[in-house]
């Protein structure tokens, strides 16, 4: 029997509530499909600050690096906003990504038929949308040097450097090409090569790698056009590959095609070692502990963990099918509530998901 070690990071706010739901479901599907999951909970973010004084204890990072996969719920609380930036909960996530050497962020966007009317776009535009944004996570303008602010004669100047090496582009492009091979075989690389030298390098490297992935159809699109096309005709996209800054913007734009951030999972991967899987949404401290949280994105993040991190695709299929079945049955948490549906709390939604498995 295959055995997998999973570190759970409940974190802050609604994190513990949605983690409990995901864990129950994972225990059921692992038994059904003949593999074993051992769970270890570790503190991160605000909960870690309360327990240890640090947003990312060394013991948490060590446990994550030794695991087969890491499932994170949510980080952040306004009660820590007065702390120095380097001591706030969010720096725990940044440190975790750096410590685990994660460079590829995956954001799937798939329209759930039962929720199609939740989108602000017309049904005929978004029906059938199923795309993946692959964003480079550790390079580009957010991390490039030099950066800073300087005083000049009678003025002040701020500056950042957008930079990528060929090897950085190659490793993120490899991830995107491999995902495209497993999906519908189309990869659109998004850049600004008409004005940026760094984007010209990006495009050249993607083109150089394309022959190694022969069946994959490769196209290029400027980022301004990509932003427009995502709302004009999102069905044209299969896999979108882009850098850190452009991906930060486009992934959030693509997320809202679904109409609810409460349904969106994500993954962050490195060249080797465990991946980090987490919902896109935040910690929602305003509803924490009130049994109002939507656990769906956490459950779908657990499905991504099974499929990508642990290579248990059949179990992932079961979790995703359970989510679809519960929504098709008219069950909703408050954030998704619509006329004619039945509103449930977090725990009751977890019970419906268990019944649907």
UniProtKB/Swiss-Prot annotation:
The cross-references to InterPro entries, in alphabetical order and at most eight, read:
IsoCit/isopropylmalate_DH_CS, IsoPropMal-DH-like_dom, Isopropylmalate_DH
The cross-references to Pfam families, in alphabetical order and at most eight, read: Iso_dh
The pathway it acts in is:
Amino-acid biosynthesis; L-leucine biosynthesis; L-leucine from 3-methyl-2-oxobutanoate: step 3/4
Q: Which cofactor does it need?
A: Mg(2+); Mn(2+)
Q: Where located?
A: Cytoplasm
**What residues does substrate bind to?**
97, 107, 135, 224
The annotated site for Important for catalysis falls at: 142, 192
Q: Which GO terms describe its molecular function?
A: 3-isopropylmalate dehydrogenase activity; magnesium ion binding; NAD binding
Write out the GO cellular component annotations. Answer: cytosol
> Which GO biological process annotations does it have?
L-leucine biosynthetic process
Q: Any keyword Metal-binding?
A: yes
Q: Cite the binding residues for NAD(+).
A: 282-294
User: Which of UniProt's keywords are assigned here?
Assistant: Amino-acid biosynthesis, Branched-chain amino acid biosynthesis, Cytoplasm, Leucine biosynthesis, Magnesium, Manganese, Metal-binding, NAD, Oxidoreductase
Reactions this protein catalyses: (2R,3S)-3-isopropylmalate + NAD(+) = 4-methyl-2-oxopentanoate + CO2 + NADH
Which superkingdom does the taxonomy of this entry point to? Answer: Bacteria
Q: Which residues bind Mg(2+)?
A: 224, 248, 252
Checking PROSITE patterns in the record gives:
IDH_IMDH
What does the cofactor section's free text say about binding?
Binds 1 Mg(2+) or Mn(2+) ion per subunit.
Query: What is the E.C. number?
Result: 1.1.1.85
Q: Record's family? A: Belongs to the isocitrate and isopropylmalate dehydrogenases family. LeuB type 1 subfamily.
Known role: Catalyzes the oxidation of 3-carboxy-2-hydroxy-4-methylpentanoate (3-isopropylmalate) to 3-carboxy-4-methyl-2-oxopentanoate. The product decarboxylates to 4-methyl-2 oxopentanoate.
**What quaternary arrangement does the UniProt entry report?**
Homodimer.
Q: What is this protein called?
A: 3-isopropylmalate dehydrogenase
Can you name the source organism?
A: Synechococcus sp. (strain CC9605)
Q: What does the organism's lineage look like at the top?
A: Bacteria, Bacillati, Cyanobacteriota, Cyanophyceae, Synechococcales
Q: Which gene encodes it?
A: leuB
């Amino acid at each position: 029997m295959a055995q997998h070690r999973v570190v759970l990071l409940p974190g802050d706010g609604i994190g513990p509530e949605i983690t409990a739901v995901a864990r129950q479901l994972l225990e059921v599907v692992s038994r059904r499909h003949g593999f074993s999951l051992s769970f270890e909970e570790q503190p991160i973010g605000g909960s870690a600050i309360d327990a240890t004084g640090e947003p990312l204890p060394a013991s948490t990072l060590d446990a994550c690096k030794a695991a087969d996969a890491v499932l994170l719920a949510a980080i952040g609380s306004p009660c820590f906003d007065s702390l120095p930036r380097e001591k706030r909960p969010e720096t725990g996530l940044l440190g975790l990504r750096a410590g685990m050497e994660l460079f590829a962020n995956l954001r799937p966007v798939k329209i759930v038929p039962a929720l199609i009317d939740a989108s602000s776009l017309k049904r005929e535009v978004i029906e059938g949308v199923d795309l993946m944004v692959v964003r480079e996570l550790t390079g580009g303008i957010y991390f490039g040097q030099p950066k800073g602010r300087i005083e000049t004669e009678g003025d002040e100047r701020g500056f950042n450097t957008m930079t990528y090496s060929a090897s950085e582009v190659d490793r993120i492009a490899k991830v995107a090409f491999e995902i495209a091979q497993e999906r519908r075989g189309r990869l659109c690389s998004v850049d600004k090569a008409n004005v940026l030298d760094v984007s010209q390098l990006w495009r050249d490297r993607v083109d150089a790698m394309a022959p190694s992935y022969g069946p994959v159809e490769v196209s290029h699109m400027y980022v301004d056009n990509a932003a427009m096309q995502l709302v004009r005709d999102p069905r044209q996209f299969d896999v979108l590959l882009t850098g850190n800054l452009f991906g930060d913007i486009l992934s959030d734009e693509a997320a809202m095609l679904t109409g609810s951030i409460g349904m969106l999972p994500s993954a962050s991967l490195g060249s080797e070692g465990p991946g980090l899987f987490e919902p896109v949404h935040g910690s929602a401290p305003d509803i924490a502990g009130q049994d109002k949280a939507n656990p769906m994105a956490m459950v779908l993040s657990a499905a991504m963990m099974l499929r990508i991190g642990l290579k248990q695709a059949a179990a992932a299929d079961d979790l995703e099918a359970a989510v679809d079945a519960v929504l098709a049955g008219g069950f909703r948490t408050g954030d998704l509530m619509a006329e004619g549906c039945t509103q449930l709390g977090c725990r009751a939604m977890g019970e419906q998901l268990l019944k649907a498995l």
